Amino acid sequence: MILKENKKMFVLPEFGRIQFEGFQRFIHQDLVEELTNFPKIEDIDQEVEFRLFGERYRLTEPCIKERDAVYQSFTYSSDLYVPAQLMRRRNGRIQRQTVHFGSIPLMNSQGTFVINGIARVVINQILRSPGIYYDSELDHNGNSIYTGTIISDWGGRFKSEIDGKKRIWVRLSKNRKVSIIILLLAMGLNMNDILKNVRYPNIFLRLFQRQAENIQSYEDAIVELYKNLYSAGGNLVFSDSICKELQTKFFQQKFELGQFGRRNLNKKLNLDVPGNEHLLLPQDLLAAVDYLIGVNYGIGTLDDIDDLKNRRVRSVADLLREQLGLALDRLEILIRQTIHTVARRKRLVTPKGLITSAPLTTIFQDFFGSHSLSQFLDQTNPLAELTHKRRLSSLGPGGLTRRTASFQVRDINPSHYGRICPIETSEGMNAGLIASLAIHAKVNDRGSLLSPFYKISKTLGEEHIVYLSSEEDEYYRIATGNTLSLDREIREERATPARYRQEFLTIAWKQIHFRSIFPFQYFSIGTSLIPFLEHNDANRALMGSNMQRQAVPLSQPEKCIVGTGLESQIALDSGSVVVSNQDGQIAYLDGETISILLQNEKTVDIKSIIYERSNNNTCIHQRPVVSQGERLRKGQLLADGTATVGGELALGRNILVAYMPWEGYNFEDAVLISERLIYEDIYTSFHIERYEINIYTTSQGPEKITKEIPHLDSYVLRHLDNNGLVVPGSWVETGDVLVGKLTPQEAENSLRVPEGKLLQAISGIQLANTRESCLKVPIGGRGRVIDVRWIYDEDTLPNIANMVHVYILQKRKIQVGDKVAGRHGNKGIVSKILPRQDMPYLQDGTPVDMILSPLGVPSRMNVGQIFECLLGLAGDILKKHYRITPFDERYEREASRKLVFSELHEASQEAAIPWLFEPDHPGKSRLIDGRTGDIFEQPVTIGKAYMMKLIHQVDDKIHARSSGPYALVTQQPLRGRSRGGGQRVGEMEVWALEGFGVSYILQEMLTIKSDHIPARSKLLGSIVTGKSIPKPNTVPESFRLLVRELRSLAVNSDHNLIFEKDLRKKVKDV
């Protein structure tokens, strides 16, 4: 973006840099510090000393390439080697060796980690920064209670409070509190020290007289603290055992402020404690309580705990450093145990004999495999991938939980301005807890979020960029982004909207310190792709941001006519496109390889990705866009990737839409489409499914991959080669065998079946002692086999495979039940596919591609879609592409509407289509019914909208069951498609069936089809023999379960048969 005033080019940041910067900090800084802090280890007699030289560590080059790690299902990692020294003081002998510490997974060029062939990403956690925070709460009487909470970096928290009687307590748990005076005296301070170092000595003196008058010494304070903590009565006397118990259970509890906590505490309480003192000291507690008294009297400020200055981001560096620290702690314990054992047995040992690679390797494996912040990378499309790397989570260890997080924590805070996107977040339970970084935000070494601003120099008249944290920018007056459009002279005359101390106000330009740099500065990359964003309700913009990440890459992608200008940057930073790193010339080109002849006569080969499966089963494929012999410049596009065209992100297609009702088929967000979208492959996508089968060694011997499978029809084995694997290129249907496998079993088991006994009795034939356990194509898995891979375990012997992967490609056209959406939160399900001749058509005979409901616009307040489709129509006719920045009303009122109408008018004039822009109803046109040829009564809004097909496809959701598993307890069918579940008729379904009076269907659903075991078993026989289905004469299993549950509560239930005449007699007697 070029700014006229200062003639400077402003460059967008690299969107994936938060991941790269974090990992580089871990490798170059945190790893060295943790290894350097590893302590010297000595035996009991101090004769043997072990130490590490962490600053001279070495990471080896990975033994496998990034792409091969994915292909062979390996982990992309590097081995860590550290020099170690073992010294024996008795004879002065020193042994130095470089020891193997284990393997550390490496970040690849995409900013992700490849673990067992699967791309994973470590997302950033945002949580409360350690330090002290002052707040006020209401007690049960409605009175304000002032509290000060010290949050640790590692450990618990201290909460001090002043109650209604002006007494000061330290709360240790929800129900336990202790007087601050008793605690300070027990921590070793005396009354003189306390009174000298506080601003309010009189208050402390009164407290001492009211709460601790009987305490004359340190010993009395220890006894009193013990009574308060453990509710001990009687006349306790000070003893070493009481003191020792308090030391171990209370004072030595891990409470570490850390580097950031110490800095925050010193700053807030004006202390001069050294920065390397990370533990909580008595003077910290004293100063904290002294400040709390001041807050109670109106001196000092309360903290907004949700302000970003009180929160910090734990990046991948902090999370990996924490895991490394745990591994080194575990290793230290193992080394100590080994040294003590060796010293006791008088054995010799080397540094390599002391260190094992297990702790580091296993801890990193557990972290990447099961930690809540190490996630399966969302690879639906390039935008989803990039957004996942820029995600901020308040959940995870040390963070919030989705059930206890309040509305206040989830809400937007003024400090988020330019740092965290106010639009993009999850829907549902995680709303407000999962956020996304704003476009220009970055994280510094202290974990603070920074946003860039132009600093306005009053003297020089120049501007330069400054990054400010939330703590810094509240002291400055910052003009908002709408001032970008104004000339300097006009700006200085007008009052300017600005932000100061988290409030919005209007002030003169000469009072401004900083100004925003970019209209998109406040939003995430997903939200920044929505054109005319300012005309949409925030809830719909949120849905639009989220649904773009669910768009399936199409086989024939198309760039949007109306965009925002960020599409090329997102495509580049996601890593889906290939660009040239140097000047040169294309020497050779085919579908898989691009060879570039450099200026120094060397040749560089670049391998393209061909039909690779993503984590979300979408297809990753790169297409060359250069020709042989073409000259290249550095940075030039070589190949388009998934969902990109010409180096720009292309998630959907520009199609002709009309906003009108059509026979009720687009009721409630349903969508009507033309069959042209199917026949011309407009919304056709490729999906690659991976099926795997393990090869085990059983107690009876190893399993065998073979084509010779007894008891199976040769038809289902027709695609297998001689080795028992399916041939790549085969078209397979449901039930076909992909991998033939035989599992050995005990001979006795096969002879127990009646056929086995009969064969053995007649002719002495021994039945085969194997059973088939083949990999077969599941229901809905039909497609083309594109690859078959043997997978070898990294830790086992070479050439012994333990798994086979089969990849099947499916070509899916759009169909009824698929979900489609625009970029403005306008989503819908395809309800009917009409022939082209039945679709409404324009006055020039062009049939409409999609009919949307007009009632979906006014109530949702996402008018941006109307602007987009009208401007798209003008762009389609004029052969133009538009890139619109948001908030264009800063130029003039109704700027968006004027732009759209002026472009429509120009298109109407140029193409000589008068009905394209009619002044009586601009943006609307008369449509003709394709079935009757009649003109519809009202003019209809038509346009070219950019619509996407989403990953929620009917093929993945539709499910039917004829037979399947039952739950053990209730004996009812399991729930869910993945478990092969069936129908479960609940109360409301029963009411619906009762309303129609279908008693037999209802009776079958509640008994035979569900949980009536005897009736279920008799049903098959009656169907086979053609007899009538027997009526159940016992109760279903769910009733038995109810009876058992009542019995477990000591309530017995019984039933007796009462004849009608007996019942009449009893009623008569009553």
Swiss-Prot record:
One of its GO terms (cellular component) is DNA-directed RNA polymerase complex. Its EC number is 2.7.7.6. It catalyses: RNA(n) + a ribonucleoside 5'-triphosphate = RNA(n+1) + diphosphate. Pfam families: RNA_pol_Rpb2_1, RNA_pol_Rpb2_2, RNA_pol_Rpb2_3, RNA_pol_Rpb2_6, RNA_pol_Rpb2_7. One of its GO terms (biological process) is DNA-templated transcription. It is found in: Plastid, Chloroplast. GO terms for molecular function: DNA binding; DNA-directed RNA polymerase activity; ribonucleoside binding. CDD domains: RNA_pol_B_RPB2 (cd00653). Keywords: Chloroplast, DNA-directed RNA polymerase, Nucleotidyltransferase, Plastid, Transcription, Transferase. It comes from the Eukaryota. It is an enzyme of class 2 (transferase). InterPro entries: DNA-dir_RNA_pol_bsu_ext_1_sf, DNA-dir_RNA_pol_su2, DNA-dir_RNAP_su2_dom, DNA-dir_RNAP_su2_hyb_sf, RNA_pol_bsu_bac, RNA_pol_bsu_CS, RNA_pol_bsu_protrusion, RNA_pol_Rpb2_2. SUPFAM superfamilies: beta and beta-prime subunits of DNA dependent RNA-polymerase (SSF64484). Its main location: plastid. Belongs to the RNA polymerase beta chain family. DNA-dependent RNA polymerase catalyzes the transcription of DNA into RNA using the four ribonucleoside triphosphates as substrates. PANTHER family: DNA-DIRECTED RNA POLYMERASE I SUBUNIT 2 (PTHR20856). In plastids the minimal PEP RNA polymerase catalytic core is composed of four subunits: alpha, beta, beta', and beta''. When a (nuclear-encoded) sigma factor is associated with the core the holoenzyme is formed, which can initiate transcription. This is DNA-directed RNA polymerase subunit beta. It comes from Angiopteris evecta (Mule's foot fern). The gene is rpoB.
